[in-house]
């Protein structure tokens, strides 16, 4: 069995069906003896360019280990499902299980937002302290 990274984009009007689609696709892979190494739901995001007058899509990424038969069946499911507006399947040399750069960046962004929105400064530093230290030497 080979390793693959699969990304598919779902029409934004069908976002509520994403959970069922992912469940169906993972079941298809696992019934054939494959494994899901990583599953990430990136949510609705702006597209770089419009696809059939659609400007947003729901992104899902899977890292799987599966047979060629299961992959062909998955590709057929993507092709005949009108809700899937784009898909990309890349062969990988090994299983990838760590978090993707997309999710890492999103977590960093949310952490920065939380720190910025916090009313008190909990790290113990005071922005004005460095200025007063510099002025004390003069």
Swiss-Prot record:
CDD domains: bS6 (cd00473). It holds the Pfam family Ribosomal_S6. GO terms for biological process: translation. One of its GO terms (molecular function) is structural constituent of ribosome. Residues 126-138 have a biased composition (Acidic residues). Belongs to the bacterial ribosomal protein bS6 family. PROSITE patterns: RIBOSOMAL_S6. Residues 97-121 have a biased composition (Basic and acidic residues). This is Small ribosomal subunit protein bS6. GO terms for cellular component: cytosolic small ribosomal subunit. The keyword Ribosomal protein applies. Residues 97-138 are annotated as: Disordered. Binds together with bS18 to 16S ribosomal RNA. Keywords: Ribonucleoprotein, Ribosomal protein, RNA-binding, rRNA-binding. The keyword Ribosomal protein applies. PANTHER family: MITOCHONDRIAL 28S RIBOSOMAL PROTEIN S6, SMALL RIBOSOMAL SUBUNIT PROTEIN BS6M.
């Amino acid at each position: 069995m080979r390793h693959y990274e699969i990304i598919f984009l779902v029409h934004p009007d069908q976002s509520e069906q994403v959970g069922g689609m992912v469940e169906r696709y993972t079941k298809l892979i696992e019934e054939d003896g494959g494994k899901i190494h990583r599953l990430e739901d990136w949510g609705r995001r702006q597209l770089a360019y419009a696809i059939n007058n659609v400007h947003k899509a729901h992104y899902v990424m899977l890292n799987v280990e599966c047979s060629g038969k299961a992959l062909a069946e998955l590709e057929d499911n993507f092709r005949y499902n009108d809700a899937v507006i784009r898909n990309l399947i890349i062969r990988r040399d090994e299983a990838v299980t760590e978090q993707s750069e997309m999710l890492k960046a999103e977590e960093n962004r949310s952490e920065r937002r939380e720190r910025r929105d916090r009313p008190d400064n909990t790290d113990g530093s005071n922005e004005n302290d460095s200025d007063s230290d510099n002025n004390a030497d003069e």
